[in-house]
Curated annotation (Swiss-Prot):
Subcellular location: Membrane
Record key words, sorted: Ion transport, Membrane, Sodium, Sodium transport, Symport, Transmembrane, Transmembrane helix, Transport
UniProt-listed GO biological process terms: citrate transport; succinate transport; transmembrane transport
Protein name: Sodium-dependent low-affinity dicarboxylate transporter 1
Tissue distribution: Nad-1 and nad-2 are coexpressed in the intestinal tract from early larvae to adults, expression is from the pharynx through to the anus. Expression level is significantly greater in the anterior half of the intestine than in the posterior half.
Gene Ontology MF annotations: citrate transmembrane transporter activity; low-affinity sodium:dicarboxylate symporter activity; succinate transmembrane transporter activity
Transmembrane segments: 17-37, 59-79, 87-107, 130-150, 224-244, 271-291, 317-337, 353-373, 401-421, 455-475, 482-502, 527-547
Function: Low affinity sodium-dicarboxylate cotransporter that accepts a range of tricarboxylic acid-cycle intermediates with 4-5 carbon atoms. There is no interaction with monocarboxylates.
Family per similarity comment: Belongs to the SLC13A/DASS transporter (TC 2.A.47) family. NADC subfamily.
PANTHER family in the cross-refs: SOLUTE CARRIER FAMILY 13 MEMBER (PTHR10283), SOLUTE CARRIER FAMILY 13 MEMBER 2 (PTHR10283:SF82)
Alphabetical list of Pfam families matching this protein: Na_sulph_symp (PF00939)
Amino acid sequence: MARKRGISSLLLIYKQSFVIWGALLIFSPLLMFVGDSHGLQAKCLYCVAVMGSYWVFEALPLAITAFIPMILFPLFGIMRSEEVARAYLPDTCFLFMGGLMVALAVEKCELHARVALFVLKTVGSEPARVMAGFMGVTGFLSMWISNTATTALMVPILQSVITELVSNHRMEDLVALCEAHHNSSRKHSVGMRRLSLPNENNEIKREEMDTAMSPREQKMAKGLMLSVCFSANIGGAATITGTASNLVLVGQLNELFPGADTGVNFLSWLIFAFPMVFCCLIYCWCVLYLLYLRDAPKGSIIVTRKLQQKYNELHAFSFAEMAVIFCFALLLVLWILREPQVVPGWGEMFKDEFVSDATSAMFIVILLFTLPEKLPSSRGSSEQRKASSGLLDWATVQDRFPWSVLFLLGGGFALAAGVKESGLSHDIGAIMRYLDVFNHNIIMLICIIISVTLTNVCSNTVIASIFIPIVAELARSLEIDPLNFMLPVTISASFAFLLPVATPPNAIVFSSGYLKVFDMFVSGLCVTLGCVVLSMLNMLLWAGFVFNLHLFPQWAANPSPPLDVQDWAVENNITFVGTSKL
């Protein structure tokens, strides 16, 4: 027994090394298909398997694993080094950078805290209403800033609210004991004592909050905590910039079908996804209410006053906050009106396909660095007249921008490019074509279930990067619009509710100490099942009208390859003179 424990501890200590070298050896038989007609596909499958193993078991940092294609693709003859490098930073990455930098500007001026407290002090202190308020605020914020940042903001506020709810509940119990102890002839003194209890509230909290919460209070705290991470995951799916997996879809569409007018843009995605996200949030609230809040302590005016007090303590609207609101609103207008579909957009003023949503995002980023944080003044001392920094500064970006996620996105795009270039996606699609014995809707449901299952054990960005090209090829082989499978796979990649390790929001909430893995798994399973059904209904009843999915589009039947510089020169009869190969 001791020997077994020693081996187990040794495996845990050297787990990282075992996974790194074990994956290389276990999948090495794939490299034996050297002279085979599918040799290139086998080599690419080896790269996918190794990267997938490293990502799932986190043998290396996720961003470092993303650089593997830069090494293996050129060595295996799948893609040239410069082609792989170009795949790491497509247009979608600049869209991601722009969206996150705007979010950093919002966080820097603390505008997000003002919005959160305003909504919470409005909904009141009833636990069910508090949950609805937190879910609404979290879902809305996660549409525009990262799910992780949203959760990190909301959890401390929620912990404060839970403390107020619990202390208020205990104070009311103490009032009830006082009323039971005194006889009816002393009603007035009891009433005076009740009025004085709020002044003793701090003393009660010091004595009582040191002890463990009652089961009823623990149950309430669990439900409120879960509502934050679940609504952050759901809300991010509502906009095309809300979560990384949505951006992966945009990048994969550009990679797999270059130059195609797929109809996927900021406005069309919002129209497609927002109704489903709204329904998912309502369903999630119902599930968590039934599981955790049916017998929760009632709220009172004290907690409402506490939220009102915190909101009143905020300073007046600063110039920075108003300027960030302006930039944020301008960005939304530029995104929505570039290709509104119903009327000509401002993008038509320029050459076709020359302007994208990334153009708008980077314009706003430069504007954030240009506009001052404080309104210039000609009065006051020389120190007061000193020029202020911009709404966003590079030190903040360097310190808080998630560069690793950018590299992870790029690695996904490079991996997808290799899968396409080697023909592996075509082969996998041909194998999956045997699913054509099923109805297309059944295949769609199978894709959703696979995506939901995998996204709970590794990054949703990874799942989207690997799985989207496969289902796209499957749809092409069945001669149906690839968006029929790509859209539900992308949406369902956000439904990571089962485990703390599934997403950073889950991990942040779990680290609060209120939850056990079993709590998250049971409630997450109920939420997942409902969200899968709602996602399926959204595809069947709504998505077809938004994206016209009923016909097999020409851009999917004959995807044009990306135009190389040399190809462009030949087409335009241009000869480069006096140039040398770099």
